[in-house]
Amino acid sequence: MTGRVWVFGDSLNTDAMYPPDAMKLDVAAAAKMVFYQVRPGWTDEVQRGDIVVAGNNFGLGSSRPVAALFNELGVAALVAEEFNSLFFRNAVNAGLPAMTVPGVTEAFSDGDIGTFDLGTGEWHNDTTGAGGTVPVLPDLILDILAGGGVLPRLAERGYLPAELAETLRSAAVAVAGSGGGA
């Protein structure tokens, strides 16, 4: 995937990404509150296909369905120097590509165009020419991401009713299923 990059720092927790007040809102309104505590107005600027780049321990904190809100905003992928393991798994479950790239915050600036290939582990800053390769994710994770997340994958494999497959890709399902949102 290729997109415009937004760079954030280290130790961004889920409370800052999805504040308690947002949990009372519907998905579209809650998504507009992502990062408002650390970068007010960001959701007015982010565009479908953009990529969030962050530092170490991205997504620490409680298990909030932030990945669903990134999906609602149209964020194409998350790339971090290191993910909190629970947050990483929630992103995969929501079908949001997440790639670990050590040193990525030094390789990109806001507005750079980045290309990230989960299948090969290759990444490239199309603006500056920097690039590299990281270990490829396991096939199971790549399959879950390709299927749009864990629930749609289960529906497509017959473990859930097939007619739910498209519905289960919805950000509203992920947020409502967590106890937040509508």
Swiss-Prot record:
Q: Pathway involvement?
A: Amino-acid biosynthesis; L-leucine biosynthesis; L-leucine from 3-methyl-2-oxobutanoate: step 2/4
**Entry's EC annotation:** 4.2.1.33
InterPro entries in the record: Aconitase/3IPM_dehydase_swvl, AconitaseA/IPMdHydase_ssu_swvl, LeuD, LeuD_type2/HacB/DmdB
> Any keyword Membrane?
no
Which EC class, in a word?
lyase
Which GO molecular function annotations are given, in alphabetical order? 3-isopropylmalate dehydratase activity
Looking up SUPFAM superfamilies in the UniProt record yields: LeuD/IlvD-like (SSF52016)
Q: Which UniProt keywords apply?
A: Amino-acid biosynthesis, Branched-chain amino acid biosynthesis, Leucine biosynthesis, Lyase
What Pfam families does the annotation carry? Aconitase_C
Q: Which reaction does it catalyse?
A: (2R,3S)-3-isopropylmalate = (2S)-2-isopropylmalate
Protein family according to the UniProt entry: Belongs to the LeuD family. LeuD type 2 subfamily.
Stated role: Catalyzes the isomerization between 2-isopropylmalate and 3-isopropylmalate, via the formation of 2-isopropylmaleate.
Q: How does it assemble?
A: Heterodimer of LeuC and LeuD.
Q: What is this protein called?
A: 3-isopropylmalate dehydratase small subunit
Source organism per entry reads Mycolicibacterium smegmatis (strain ATCC 700084 / mc(2)155) (Mycobacterium smegmatis)
Q: What is the lineage of its organism?
A: Bacteria, Bacillati, Actinomycetota, Actinomycetes, Mycobacteriales
Q: Which gene encodes it?
A: leuD
